[in-house]
Amino acid sequence: MSDLKAAALRALKLMDLTTLNDDDTDAKVIALCHDAKTPVGNTAAICIYPRFIPIAKKTLREQGTPEVRIATVTNFPHGNDDIEIAVAETKAAVAYGADEVDVVFPYRALMAGDEKVGFELVKQCKEACGDILLKVIIETGELKEEALIKKASQICIEAGADFIKTSTGKVPVNATPEYARMMLEVIRDMGVAEKVGFKPAGGVRTAEDAAAYLAMADDILGSEWADNMHYRFGASSLLTNLLNTLEVTDQVADPAAY
């Protein structure tokens, strides 16, 4: 197997296959669940709006892939600084049956100099999650500056985040290798690689993109680190490219680019 094919197979099994569009329907989510089951293995998870969790759970069970995790989003996509609403949404997501919650960090508050609200929001959302995985989206493409990206990453980790995630996919600039490096370096420098993972989201579209991101993680945190409890790709159009790279052709087309 070529290096690119090996990276494509690895990336496929680390995907949070995503649809977070205003026109999502039960039918689209059912199709997403079908796409998560491929001839070369399943994606790690699907990522959907909370209201679709019951139909997704049913579909994954019926197609024999109950191990595919269901991630959902809260405080999404704007990252407001209302802790009460973020926590209420997170509790509702857990009640719906989410396996993982991707919450948006109040990044604009941090840009305005408020570090406390972000810490408290993440801390309380993690308390609401209990053992359920909490990924925190810091919106790197809006923070832009290295100091802010690293500060947001540190705050999330100190507050109990299980993963730090680049982006919502809803702003002009989403994951970039530069932003990924900054966040991975925080995980390394804080000595939390055993318990904190990383998720680039939005803009990872090809096997070559995925291979470069994985090579960076291997370089910074070691070649064994990026397993499915420490690394995810938030993407949709990536899956088709990975399957094409792996020469798998009988897969349904997946949702709009993320």
Curated annotation (Swiss-Prot):
SUPFAM superfamilies: Aldolase (SSF51569)
Biological processes per GO annotation: 2-deoxyribose 1-phosphate catabolic process; carbohydrate catabolic process; deoxyribonucleotide catabolic process
Role, per record: Catalyzes a reversible aldol reaction between acetaldehyde and D-glyceraldehyde 3-phosphate to generate 2-deoxy-D-ribose 5-phosphate.
One GO CC term on file: cytoplasm
GO molecular function, one term: deoxyribose-phosphate aldolase activity
Family: Belongs to the DeoC/FbaB aldolase family. DeoC type 2 subfamily.
Compartments it resides in: Cytoplasm
Higher taxonomy: Bacteria, Pseudomonadati, Pseudomonadota, Gammaproteobacteria, Vibrionales
Cited InterPro entries: Aldolase_TIM, DeoC, DeoC/FbaB/LacD_aldolase, DeoC_typeII
Principal subcellular localisation of the protein: cytoplasm
UniProt entry keywords in alphabetical sequence: Cytoplasm, Lyase, Schiff base
Stated name of the protein: Deoxyribose-phosphate aldolase 2
Active site, UniProt feature: D102, K165, K199
Catalyzed chemical reaction(s): 2-deoxy-D-ribose 5-phosphate = D-glyceraldehyde 3-phosphate + acetaldehyde
Enzyme Commission number: 4.1.2.4
